[in-house]
Amino acid sequence: MKLNELFAGLPKRRRLKVLGRGLGCGKGKTSGRGHKGQKARSGCAVNGFEGGQQPIFTRLPKRGFRSMSRARYEIVNIGALQRLISEKKIVDASNISKELMAELGMIPSPMSKVKILGKGALKAKVGISYDAVSKAAWEESLLTEGLSDS
């Protein structure tokens, strides 16, 4: 194999036509966009426009409602806590605060609401500050009572 044979079998890519460089070049003046009109302007794509046909978002029925007052919890699994304890990232397992969880990247902010879920298992008793706990996490884990912030 020689350097001049490297691209021998590959199809050649057609050179793109340069736009807007005079009437003689074939794509001058309006640069293949036609005359005036919405599609001749820059940034022409109209989101959701389907050529006059009823757009999909108006054809489909409206569904659902999202409550502004609904509590949204950040989820922390007890298995993830045990992994951090095993890796010695959590030294004092008797007092795992929201500040520590935020520092370790488990939750975005110490102000976040935290719900403990039962995926995984704990090996020792742990004290965690939380707002809610699942039934499975409460039954299977060794969570201590009284540290909830709510």
From Swiss-Prot:
Any matching Pfam family: Ribosomal_L27A
InterPro entries: Ribosomal_uL15, Ribosomal_uL15/eL18, Ribosomal_uL15/eL18_sf, Ribosomal_uL15_bac-type
GO biological process: translation
Keyword Ribonucleoprotein: yes
Molecular function as annotated in GO: rRNA binding; structural constituent of ribosome
Record field: transmembrane: none
UniProt KW keywords: Ribonucleoprotein, Ribosomal protein, RNA-binding, rRNA-binding
This protein's GO CC annotations: large ribosomal subunit
Assembly: Part of the 50S ribosomal subunit.
Stated family: Belongs to the universal ribosomal protein uL15 family.
NCBIfam families, per the entry: rplO_bact
HAMAP family: Ribosomal_uL15 (MF_01341)
Role, per record: Binds to the 23S rRNA.
Protein name: Large ribosomal subunit protein uL15
